[in-house]
Curated annotation (Swiss-Prot):
It comes from Conus gloriamaris (Glory-of-the-Sea cone). Conantokins inhibit N-methyl-D-aspartate (NMDA) receptors. It is found in: Secreted. One of its GO terms (cellular component) is extracellular region. The keyword Zinc-finger does not apply. Keywords: Gamma-carboxyglutamic acid, Ion channel impairing toxin, Ionotropic glutamate receptor inhibitor, Neurotoxin, Postsynaptic neurotoxin, Secreted, Toxin. This is Conantokin-Gm.
Length: 18
């Protein structure tokens, strides 16, 4: 669903921070 896709994007952004 759209929620899952949004979550994946947020996770990617967090990974960039690490």
């Amino acid at each position: 669903g759209a929620k899952e896709r949004n979550n994946a994007e947020a996770v990617r952004e967090r990974l960039e921070e690490i």
